[in-house]
C-alpha cells in the first residue's frame, strides 16, 4: 500500500512455482517490491497496469528494466511502452493461473479489471463503498455505469473485490457486499 497515493499493489504467485506478477505497481515502491520478491524467492515475469491516470505513477518500466518482466495493459491504452496489450475476455497466464482481462471503461477510457478465479482486481472502476471518478482525464459516466452494472456486478456475489485505491483503510470486499452497501451503486440508471 502506497500511503502517498492510497494505491494498493498486488503481488500474485501461483504457489506452485517461482513466477510472480504485480498489478498496479507504484514507481516509488519498486525497491520494496524487489525486496519482497527476493524474500519469497519469486521471479517477476509480468506487470499489469489497470489504467493510466494522474494518481497511477507506474513502476512497470523500472521493474522491466530490473527484472526483464513483460509489461501488460489493456488494448485501449495510449501507452507506447507496454509490451503486451490484452483484449477484453483474453487470458493472461501465470504458471497454472489464468487471469481474465475485462475491459471496464468509465473511470478512464483505458480502464481494465482483471479476474482470477473469484478474485477481482478492479483498478479504479469499482472501489469499496465507491467508484472511480469520471469527471476528468477521459472519464465517462455512462461507460462507468455499463462497466459496473453490466459486467462487474454480474459476477457471483462471493467474488472478492480488490480495488487499486481505498481512502478509509478497507482492503477487501465482495461483489455481494458492494451491491448492498455501496452508496454509489444505489442508482437506477444514468
Q: At which residue positions do the language-model features occur?
A:
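Short secondary-structure boundary/capping segments
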Residues: 1-2, 13-14, 61-62, 83-84, ...
Amino acid at each position: 500500500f502506497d500511503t502517498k497515493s492510497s494505491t494498493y499493489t498486488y503481488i500474485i504467485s501461483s504457489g506452485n512455482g517461482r513466477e510472480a506478477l504485480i498489478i498496479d505497481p507504484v514507481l516509488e515502491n519498486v525497491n520494496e517490491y524487489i525486496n519482497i520478491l527476493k524474500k519469497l524467492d519469486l521471479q517477476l515475469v509480468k506487470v499489469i497496469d489497470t489504467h493510466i491516470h494522474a494518481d497511477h505513477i507506474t513502476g512497470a518500466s523500472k521493474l522491466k528494466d530490473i527484472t526483464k518482466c513483460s509489461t501488460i495493459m489493456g488494448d485501449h491504452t495510449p501507452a507506447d511502452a507496454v509490451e503486451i496489450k490484452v483484449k477484453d475476455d483474453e487470458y493472461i497466464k501465470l504458471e497454472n493461473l489464468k487471469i481474465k482481462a475485462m475491459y471496464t471503461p468509465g473511470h478512464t477510457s483505458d480502464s481494465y479489471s482483471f479476474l482470477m478465479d473469484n478474485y477481482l482486481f478492479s483498478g479504479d472502476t469499482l472501489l469499496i463503498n465507491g467508484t472511480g471518478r469520471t469527471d476528468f482525464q477521459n472519464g465517462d459516466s455512462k461507460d462507468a455505469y455499463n462497466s459496473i452494472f453490466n459486467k462487474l456486478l454480474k459476477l457471483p456475489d462471493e467474488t472478492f473485490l480488490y480495488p487499486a485505491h481505498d481512502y478509509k483503510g478497507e482492503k477487501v470486499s465482495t461483489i455481494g457486499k458492494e451491491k448492498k452497501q455501496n452508496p454509489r451503486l444505489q442508482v437506477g440508471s444514468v
